């Protein structure tokens, strides 16, 4: 059943693939006709594989976000959850070697990757080893570990729109970024419990049915929060949705 559903969705990808592959990180939404015609794709919660990464421990917000997210998705029925942290004793150490190995690992019928840390236009910061995970390295790791399976990637960091590259825009993927390539994100100070983006993502998790709905609701939440707090140069969260994942449901939904 899963293979047949994915095959039907790949046909839709041929319609929207050119559009998705020729735009910059300010992604336009999929055409309404593509979303409307895409059948709902539901993967059993116990067939999802999750990789959660807190890349830095200079603020408690990063570990807090990952710890809470782990509890939430476990409550949704996800069992294969691997956590990486820059803080010893809170999970496997989030250095480039460990995170790369976790992303390369295969298994399950769908992949969920959530990474929160600092970042710049070259990639995602991993404090252990003071290394950067680049967009090309993430794309290659996902290609090997997740292949053509439905894949959802969230990068919660400054300038994280840099991960929505042409090679990464594949029909089976959803890529969610907390900020545009030329923008910073907020809420990673020593006094923050969560980053702004992580806070909104967690707040919107219960009300969404599909990953696309969750990303759009989170973006709206971030915009409202930044306006309320008087942020002058907003983060502008980004979203890419591959046509084969247009109506991919969250685990347990």
Task: For each feature predicted by the language model, list its residue ranges.
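Bacterial N-terminal signal peptides that target proteins for export
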Residues: 1-10
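Bacterial N-terminal signal peptides
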Residues: 9-18
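Boundary/activation segment at the start of structured domains
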Residues: 18, 22-109, 187-195, 246-253
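Caspase-like cysteine protease fold
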Residues: 30-35, 41-43, 50, 207-253
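Extracytoplasmic/secreted cell-surface and envelope-processing proteins
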Residues: 59-63, 91-93, 121-127, 135, ...
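Active-site microenvironments of hydrolase-like enzyme catalytic domains
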Residues: 100-129, 157-184
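A short, glycine/acidic-enriched catalytic loop
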Residues: 117-147
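Active-site-proximal C-terminal subdomain of hydrolase catalytic domains
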Residues: 152, 157-234
């Amino acid at each position: 059943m899963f293979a047949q559903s994915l095959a039907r969705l790949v046909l839709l990808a041929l319609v929207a693939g050119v559009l998705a592959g020729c735009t910059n990180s300010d992604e336009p939404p999929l055409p309404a006709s593509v979303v409307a015609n895409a059948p709902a794709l539901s993967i059993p919660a116990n067939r999802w594989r999750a990789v959660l990464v807190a890349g830095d421990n200079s603020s408690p917000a990063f570990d807090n976000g990952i710890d809470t997210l782990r509890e939430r998705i476990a409550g949704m029925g996800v069992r294969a959850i691997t956590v990486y942290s820059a803080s010893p004793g809170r999970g496997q150490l989030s250095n480039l070697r460990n995170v790369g190995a976790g992303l390369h690992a295969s298994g399950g019928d769908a992949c969920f990757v959530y990474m929160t840390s600092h970042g710049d236009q070259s990639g995602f910061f991993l404090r252990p080893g003071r290394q950067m995970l680049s967009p090309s390295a993430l794309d290659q790791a996902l290609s090997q570990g997740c292949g053509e399976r439905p894949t959802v990637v969230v990068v919660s960091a400054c300038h994280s729109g840099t991960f929505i590259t042409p090679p990464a825009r594949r029909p089976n993927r959803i890529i969610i970024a907390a900020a545009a390539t030329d923008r910073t994100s907020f809420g990673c100070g020593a006094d923050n419990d969560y980053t702004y983006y992580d806070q909104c993502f967690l707040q919107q998790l219960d009300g969404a049915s599909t990953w696309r709905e969750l990303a759009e609701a989170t973006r709206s939440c971030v915009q409202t929060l930044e306006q309320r707090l008087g942020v002058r140069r907003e983060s502008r969260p980004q979203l890419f949705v591959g046509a084969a994942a247009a109506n991919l449901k969250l685990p347990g939904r």
